[in-house]
Amino acid sequence: MHSRGREIVVLLNPWSINEAVSSYCTYFIKQDSKSFGIMVSWKGIYFILTLFWGSFFGSIFMLSPFLPLMFVNPSWYRWINNRLVATWLTLPVALLETMFGVKVIITGDAFVPGERSVIIMNHRTRMDWMFLWNCLMRYSYLRLEKICLKASLKGVPGFGWAMQAAAYIFIHRKWKDDKSHFEDMIDYFCDIHEPLQLLIFPEGTDLTENSKSRSNAFAEKNGLQKYEYVLHPRTTGFTFVVDRLREGKNLDAVHDITVAYPHNIPQSEKHLLQGDFPREIHFHVHRYPIDTLPTSKEDLQLWCHKRWEEKEERLRSFYQGEKNFYFTGQSVIPPCKSELRVLVVKLLSILYWTLFSPAMCLLIYLYSLVKWYFIITIVIFVLQERIFGGLEIIELACYRLLHKQPHLNSKKNE
C-alpha cells in the first residue's frame, strides 16, 4: 500500500492530549515556518507525535516497572528490556510502510538470523539508523540491535529514556572519553552472554556539503581519494569494537551495509516533519564471517578503508545508473520471515500503540495512584540521568556490585 501520489491532509488522534499537543505544535511550527520557509505536513506531525507518545508512555508504564530487577539480576533485566523495547521499534517500521508507502529493497548477502555481529553502514542521512529497522525486522531480530549514539540524546524525554533502558552506547565523539565506556559496555554484554548486533557509523556524521568538504580536505591533506557519495571513515572505534567483541567470543560476523535513496533523500528530522518520507530505501548487504577478517589493528583499519572505497564505486553506479543494486549481480535476499508475518506484526503494532497511549492517559486521569506513579517515575528518570549519568550506567554498576567486579575490563587489562 503506497501513498506516493497522495497527500494525507489530516490524521486525527483519538485522545485529547495528543490533539492539544498537535494544536500547539501546529501553531508554533506555522509561526516558525513563516520565518524560515518550512512547510509542515500533518502526516509528519502525526508520525513524530505517535513515536514520541509511544516512547514516553512506554518508558513509564512498560520499562520502569522492571527497573527494580536491575538491582537483583541485571542479565534478566537486560533480557526482558530488549524485548520490550523491540515492541516499540516495530512502530516506525509499521508507520513508514503501511501508512506512508515507503518501499524497502534489500540485496546482497543473507543474514544469519540471531547471529552476533557488528553492522557498519554509510551515513547518508540523520535517520539511517531508524530506516535500518525496516531491514532488520525482516532479516534479523530487532531485540538484538544496539546503536552508538550522541550522548546528548539520552536526556530527551521518552526517546532518551527508552534508549537508556535499551543499553544503547552513548558517546561524546572524543575517543579519550569514549574508550572506557565502550570497554565497559562491550565487556558487560560479553559477560552476560547477551547477543547483539551493534550498529556503527564509521563516518561519524551524515553526508552533507559541509561534512563532505571536511572529508575531502582531510583526503587532500593525506593524499587520499576524494569521495562524492561517502565520507572517509574513522576506524579507531570500529577496530576497537571488533577486537573487543572477538576477545569476548561474542562476534560471528561483520555486516557491511550500503544504504541508498533513489528518489527523495530526507536528510534530517525536519524533512520527516514536513512529511518528506523516502519513497524507496535500498540496502545492499555484505556479510563477512569473523574468521575472514584481519587480526591486527592496522590490517583491520585498511580493511575498513577498502570497504569504503567499494561503497563509493557502488553508490556511484547506483546513482548514475538505474538506481538499484542489481548491477552487483546479486538479487533481492529472501527474508527469514514471511511478508504475511511481517504484515501481521505491523498491523498489531499500529493497533497496540494507538490504543496504549490513550489508555495510559485515561488511567492517569481516573486514578490518583496512577497519577502519582506517573509523576514519580518522570522525576526518577530525570534525576537518575543527571546524578548517575543514565540507566545503562546504573545497570553496569549493579552488575559490578553483584559480581564484585570493580571494573568489567580489569581481567583484560591485567
Swiss-Prot record:
Q: Which residues cross the membrane?
A: 47-67, 86-106, 340-360, 362-382
Q: Which reaction does it catalyse?
A: a 1-acyl-sn-glycero-3-phosphate + an acyl-CoA = a 1,2-diacyl-sn-glycero-3-phosphate + CoA; a 1-acyl-sn-glycero-3-phospho-(1D-myo-inositol) + an acyl-CoA = a 1,2-diacyl-sn-glycero-3-phospho-(1D-myo-inositol) + CoA; 1-acyl-sn-glycero-3-phospho-(1'-sn-glycerol) + an acyl-CoA = a 1,2-diacyl-sn-glycero-3-phospho-(1'-sn-glycerol) + CoA; 1-hexadecanoyl-sn-glycero-3-phosphate + (9Z)-octadecenoyl-CoA = 1-hexadecanoyl-2-(9Z-octadecenoyl)-sn-glycero-3-phosphate + CoA
**InterPro entries per the record?**
Acyltransf_C (IPR032098), Plipid/glycerol_acylTrfase (IPR002123)
Q: In which tissues is it expressed?
A: Expressed at higher level in heart, kidney and pancreas than in brain, spleen, liver, lung, small intestine and placenta.
- Which parts of the sequence form the motif HXXXXD motif? 123-128
Question: Which UniProt keywords are listed?
Answer: Acetylation, Acyltransferase, Developmental protein, Endoplasmic reticulum, Lipid biosynthesis, Lipid metabolism, Membrane, Phospholipid biosynthesis, Phospholipid metabolism, Transferase, Transmembrane, Transmembrane helix
Q: Which SMART domains match?
A: PlsC
Q: How does it sit in the membrane?
A: Multi-pass membrane protein
Cellular component aspect of the GO annotation: cytosol; endomembrane system; endoplasmic reticulum; endoplasmic reticulum membrane; membrane
Identify the metabolic or biological route this protein is part of: Phospholipid metabolism; CDP-diacylglycerol biosynthesis; CDP-diacylglycerol from sn-glycerol 3-phosphate: step 2/3
Q: Which Pfam families match?
A: Acyltransf_C (PF16076), Acyltransferase (PF01553)
Please give the chief subcellular localization of this protein: endoplasmic reticulum
In the record, biological process GO terms are:
cardiolipin acyl-chain remodeling; CDP-diacylglycerol biosynthetic process; phosphatidic acid biosynthetic process; phosphatidylinositol acyl-chain remodeling
Give the subcellular location: Endoplasmic reticulum membrane
Q: What's the EC number here?
A: 2.3.1.-, 2.3.1.51
PTM annotation (N6-acetyllysine): residues: K221
Please describe what this protein does: Exhibits acyl-CoA:lysocardiolipin acyltransferase (ALCAT) activity; catalyzes the reacylation of lyso-cardiolipin to cardiolipin (CL), a key step in CL remodeling. Recognizes both monolysocardiolipin and dilysocardiolipin as substrates with a preference for linoleoyl-CoA and oleoyl-CoA as acyl donors.
What does the sequence similarity comment in the record state about its family? Belongs to the 1-acyl-sn-glycerol-3-phosphate acyltransferase family.
What's said on domains?
The HXXXXD motif is essential for acyltransferase activity and may constitute the binding site for the phosphate moiety of the glycerol-3-phosphate.
Please give the PANTHER family that the UniProt record associates with this protein: 1-ACYLGLYCEROL-3-PHOSPHATE ACYLTRANSFERASE-RELATED, LYSOCARDIOLIPIN ACYLTRANSFERASE 1
Its name, as the record gives it, is Lysocardiolipin acyltransferase 1
What is the native source organism of this protein?
Homo sapiens (Human)
